[in-house]
Structures are given as C-alpha cells and as structure tokens.
C-alpha cells in the first residue's frame, strides 16, 4: 500500500495543503483498518476527519476488550505516546502509528475483492434462490436491502462493506462495526482472523448469520420474557405465528409480498406513538433524518409475526420502529 501521506511536516486536514493522492492514500489506509466506511476520493472532508478522530480515540483508549470478546491486539499499543488528543487531523505522529498498524499482521485488515461487482451479483442471486425454510426469504432479502443494499463489497473501493456506529455521545469512538451484506456486528476492534474468515471472506456465511439472527429474534424476542411490545399491544400474548398459511399450502412462507399488499397500509408521521397507547413516539434520529413514512403495510394485518421479528432484529426503541417501517415497505415493494 502506498503511503505518500508520510512526509516530514505534512498535516492532512480539512482545508489543508495535502495533495489529492496523499489524501487518497490516507483514506485507503483508514478504510483497510476499519475506520472509514467509504469515500476514497482524495478530498479531506467530514468523513475523513471523523475517521481520523476515531483512530485517534482508539489509540488513546482502545485496549482491545469488548463485550463480545477481545480483539487480537490493543490499538493503544501502537500509540507509544505519539497521539495525545483527538483533533481530526493527521499529523506525522499519527501517520507513523498508521504505518506500524499496516505493517503488523496481528492487526487484521479488511478483505477486498478483485471483482466486487461480480461477487455482489453472485451473492444476490444466491440469496434470492434461498428456500424459505427457517425464515421467509422475502423478509430476509428485505433486511439485507436495508442493511447493505444487497452488497457484500463496496463496489467503489472493493473492500468489504462496513457500517460504523457511533453511540458514545460526545466522543469520536466507533462503538461497533457491521460487516458485509448482512452487517454482522462486532463491538471489539480490530476483528480476529477467525471472524474475517467466518463472515467477511465468505458472503454465504454472512447471510447464514443473518438468517440465524432473524430466526432467533422470532423465537425469543417476540413473545415471552423479552417480548415485542407492539406485538403484545396489537395481537396479544398468544403463540407465535410462523405463517398464516398451513405448512402444506404452496404459499407457506413464500407469499409474503402478497400478504403485505393484502395487509393494507397506513401513513406514519413524526410524533405518532409507536403503537396505540405507547409512550414512545416516532422521531428523527442520528440514523434516520425523517420520521415520515407514507403508505407502510400494516404489521398487525399480515397474519404472522415476522413483522414484529424484523423490528427486534434491530433491537428496540425508536430506531427499531424506523427499521420496521422500511423493511415492511421493502417486503411489499422490492422487485
């Protein structure tokens, strides 16, 4: 990897004097180590500044621990006193940290594809052909459309598709990262080699994890101790409903688009309660700029519990209701 950003006295920053090639090399480095989600364009703007800030934060604070296990290395080990604050600008002290990270095989870099367009087309075809056994494929495809636009690789830069969450308000920290077509999420960074092999190198395994996650949410987060409050309010606490059709009906788990059409629709507006009687209301968030959703299929009229499971796939709270609305729209409208 070319590292033209390593130059005595050079500082790469917004409005700085770095050349487009120097900025591109820095962006490519940040992309490969999981701090930039895309945009290798030679322009040092807000996205690049946020990526630099996130790396600076980790050099100061990331000891490799995570609630889902430990990273193979502590990012702090590369600092060696060179980075003392989060500035959003890459000086030569930070550049030297990046060089050491890139040269250390223990810091796992993100995989890339020699043919991202072809590989994305291939995995889309495989997903579309999946049988609706453990989960309805129409719902799964609708989730993957929302998560990654049905892409495992970012076609603009060839690296595996990555989503960066920043949920530690007031800091530059990237709190979790979603990878690939299903945006399988981990909370430690960098990832371990086994994780790269499991759900980054192999798109099919990534999709399988999404299938398993959706089925787990259906089985354990709709009815019972960790129930879906919208389902309880609208349907009650009765048994889970896999499909409104019997298992021997040819429409079983496959006629979801027609069910979405038959369910009718409603407009969802900002300040609407999540459901009748709910204290929470639809509001814009850092992930969803608008809380206006016209013509969304009525979740309670599907005759199954997958509309509630897809919300729990995203967790709980206001973001999960945004997510649910978008997935239900996909179920009905995707070609």
Which role fits each region the language model picked out?
Residues 1-125, 309:
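Cell-envelope/ECM-targeting effectors and their regulatory/trafficking segments
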Residues 86-89, 105-335:
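Catalytic glycan-binding domains that act on GlcNAc-containing polysaccharides
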